[in-house]
């Protein structure tokens, strides 16, 4: 069995959380699941830059909300995210995961001043306190179209090969609807391939 500490649950504060929902989150936290901040709305404003347009087209659709913001806006969003946990009696993980792993343009000095220590991207995890990037391969299953299924299969195989060759840990990303998408039948098999698990602070 995978220990709760190895399964980090991502929380989007700006959603419509009821009192029962918050009690459920507190119960999950009490059972040992880390709760990580995950943006604010999980929705972005219309793309204004070519980079954001291409990112939306090929990767993130309308969820990469950091890419709509400048550095100050990104920092404010992350601060608000952390504050929401505290105000609702929840213990935030030291990890922050931007929607679609798209952190946006923000300076290392600004990240170091924020209450989260670790920031996850497609390529790995950035430790803002130590100012170092920990490269970690990633596999995912959010494939609701044939194109996404094909490209994610290639992505997953390449990242598994990278993990094996470099002797690195492999991150496994599972979204709530992934089991019902085109790669849903692969999720359990990938999880079974894991011979041990780590929590994020253990990577530092």
Describe each model-derived feature in a short phrase.
Residues 28, 33-52:
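Short, solvent-exposed beta-strand-terminating loops
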Residues 67-142, 180-185:
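Catalytic domains of cell-wall/extracellular-matrix polysaccharide-remodeling enzymes
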Residues 132-182:
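A conserved mid-domain beta-alpha-beta active-site/ligand-binding segment of alpha/beta enzyme cores
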Residues 49-69:
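Active-site gating loops and adjacent loop-to-helix segments of metal-dependent hydrolytic enzymes
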Residues 10-21, 43-47, 97-106, 146-153, ...:
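Acidic-and-aromatic substrate-binding clefts and catalytic sites of carbohydrate-active enzymes
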Residues 7-9, 35-38, 94-96, 118-121, ...:
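Hydrophobic faces of well-ordered beta-strands that scaffold small-molecule active sites
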Residues 1-34, 93:
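Active-site beta->alpha N-cap acidic-glycine motif
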Residues 2, 7-8, 118-119, 169, ...:
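C-terminal domain-boundary segment and adjacent tail
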């Amino acid at each position: 069995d995978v220990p709760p500490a190895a399964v980090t649950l991502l929380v989007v504060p700006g959603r419509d959380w009821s009192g029962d929902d918050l009690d459920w989150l507190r119960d999950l936290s009490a059972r040992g699941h880390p709760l990580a901040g995950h943006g604010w709305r999980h929705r972005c404003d219309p793309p204004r830059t070519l980079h954001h347009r291409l990112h939306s087209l090929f990767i993130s659709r309308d969820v990469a909300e950091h890419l709509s913001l400048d550095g100050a806006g990104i920092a404010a969003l992350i601060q608000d995210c952390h504050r929401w946990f505290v105000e609702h009696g929840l213990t935030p993980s030291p990890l922050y995961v931007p929607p679609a792993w798209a952190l946006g343009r923000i300076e290392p000095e600004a990240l170091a001043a924020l209450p989260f220590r670790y920031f996850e991207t497609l390529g790995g995890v950035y430790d803002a306190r130590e100012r170092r990037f920990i490269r970690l391969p990633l596999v995912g299953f959010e494939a609701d179209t044939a194109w996404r299924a094909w490209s994610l299969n290639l992505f997953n195989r390449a990242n598994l090969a990278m993990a094996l060759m470099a002797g690195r840990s492999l991150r496994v990303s599972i979204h709530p609807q992934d089991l019902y998408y085109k790669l849903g039948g692969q999720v359990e098999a990938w999880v079974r391939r894991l011979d041990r698990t780590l929590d994020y602070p253990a990577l530092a």
